[in-house]
A protein has these predicted regions:
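Helical element adjacent to the flavin cofactor pocket in flavoenzyme catalytic cores
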Residues: 1-39
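Active-site substrate-recognition segment that forms the wall
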Residues: 19, 35-36, 43-75, 79-168
């Protein structure tokens, strides 16, 4: 999408917005490294829309944490039936997801919580990784305990009616 933007559209990524206001159909934005005035703007803020004073009671950030195993050895892969790649997705938006990737890794996400996503410590991340290790062990008890290679967290935005917030 970025590569196909028309010439009259400018993209500002990783630009901390300090203040904005709208006056007579002109939007003024003050950033750390400069200012812009425009008639139209897209604030791509995910769960942080309310920090801009927009739709304060409509959405909030949810922290999701996922872990991925290292690639399974031939022996480990055979012990779980040598499956093709597969995935189980939840019926509910915040339910657990587990997948077997083409390169024999297991990806699991089974934590969704209201948590300040900018302040997760390494020990908190390790706690969540332990939950995911438990989820993998319940389904695949024959796999070793040290199988998780990486764990990460990110945010998604939830709105009161489970839809996106997009308007002029």
């Amino acid at each position: 999408m970025i590569d196909t933007l028309p010439d009259n559209v400018e993209l500002f990524e990783n630009s901390q917005l300090l203040e904005w206001n709208k006056n007579n159909q002109i939007i003024s934005c003050q950033f750390k490294n400069g200012n812009i005035k425009t008639k139209k703007i897209i604030f791509a803020t995910n769960g942080f829309l309310k920090s801009l004073g927009i739709k304060k009671n409509y959405n909030f950030p949810i922290t999701l944490t996922a872990s991925m195993t290292r690639s399974l050895t031939d022996e480990e892969f055979e012990s779980i039936g040598s499956p093709q790649e597969w995935g189980v997705l939840p019926v509910r938006p915040m339910g657990a997801t587990i997948r077997m990737t083409k390169d024999r890794r297991i990806l699991i996400r089974n934590t969704a919580e209201v948590h300040n996503p900018l302040r997760m410590s390494q020990s908190e991340l390790i706690k969540r990784s332990s939950k995911q290790k438990l989820g993998i062990k319940k389904r695949f008890p024959q796999l070793p305990n040290n199988i998780i290679q990486s764990t990460w967290s990110g945010i998604v935005s939830r709105s009161r009616n489970s839809s996106q917030i997009f308007e002029k």
